[in-house]
Amino acid sequence: MKWIEVQVTTTQEAEEAVTNIMHELGAGGVVIKNPNDVKLLAQSDNWDYLDSSLFEEEGNIKVFAYFPIASDTTDKINILKDRIVELKSFGIDIGNFDVKVSEVDEADWENNWKQYYKPLKIGKKIVIKPSWEEYVSQGEEIIIELDPGMAFGTGTHETTKMCLEFLEDIVMPESIVFDVGCGSGILSITSSKLGAKEVYAADIDEVSVEVARQNVELNNLQNVKVFKSDLLSEFRGKADIIVANIIADVIIKLSAEVPKYLKEEGLFLASGIIKSRKEEVLQKVEEFFEVLQIREEGEWCAILSRKK
């Protein structure tokens, strides 16, 4: 089967938004080539081999989307271009935006990359395991089964990794967790496996909602509820922890709303914040929260705060 490969060159800041647009347009797969991710993974012991050419590229991110050849494929590509350019109106830097389109065979991308994706340990005991890989838990490790590439959130991106490390420290046995913009469901699944009592996960993107449901089922979890919601609009009740791994503009918008959905002294974990906008986000967060800790990795930061 032939597929259309759409290669978008953009910035780290725009990476997540571009990926989400691709999924919303029905991409059969999305692959992100990020030099910083390669450097991060190289620090672990989960790789048998790392090609030196992977370290030669610096700067821009390349995001590849794969669409089946159909009568509306050209229209989808044009919509993709328009929506990426539109990101500038939301204050997102798309950099030297470039799009290349080519035709590829399914075998060139659908399965070959899997041999290089290995179980990844994050924090003290979290292990992200691709669904096709065999792995035996060591000691107190908790295994998160995931089919990467279907929606944002595989554990390799700095924003997701920092959230997982924070969750390992803050989730308690009686915790109720709200995951806003859940993507693949990785943060919700991890919260449940860390012992949370109830977890509610939502995304505005129907593809992400379906993917998160599949991953929850893959992990045999009964206490994680996944649904469609525009940010917090469909959430009910109050949580001990609200996590949002989104983008700076949305974190700023959410900051005034999150306290209404948090219990007294509840925690707000915000990630997906590019370093260049950290101070802007902090200024808004500090209006409603006491900032407890800030973590930085690569070009990104995550903020843990407590309701005032």
Swiss-Prot record:
InterPro entries: Ribosomal_L11_MeTrfase_PrmA (IPR050078), Ribosomal_PrmA_MeTrfase (IPR004498), SAM-dependent_MTases_sf (IPR029063). Its EC number is 2.1.1.-. It catalyses: L-lysyl-[protein] + 3 S-adenosyl-L-methionine = N(6),N(6),N(6)-trimethyl-L-lysyl-[protein] + 3 S-adenosyl-L-homocysteine + 3 H(+). It is found in: Cytoplasm. CDD domains: AdoMet_MTases (cd02440). Its main location: cytoplasm. One of its GO terms (biological process) is methylation. S-adenosyl-L-methionine binds at T160, G181, D203, N245. It comes from the Bacteria. GO terms for cellular component: cytoplasm. Keywords: Cytoplasm, Methyltransferase, S-adenosyl-L-methionine, Transferase. Pfam families: PrmA. GO terms for molecular function: protein-lysine N-methyltransferase activity. Methylates ribosomal protein L11. Belongs to the methyltransferase superfamily. PrmA family. This is Ribosomal protein L11 methyltransferase. The lineage of its organism: Bacteria, Bacillati, Bacillota, Clostridia, Thermoanaerobacterales. The gene is prmA.
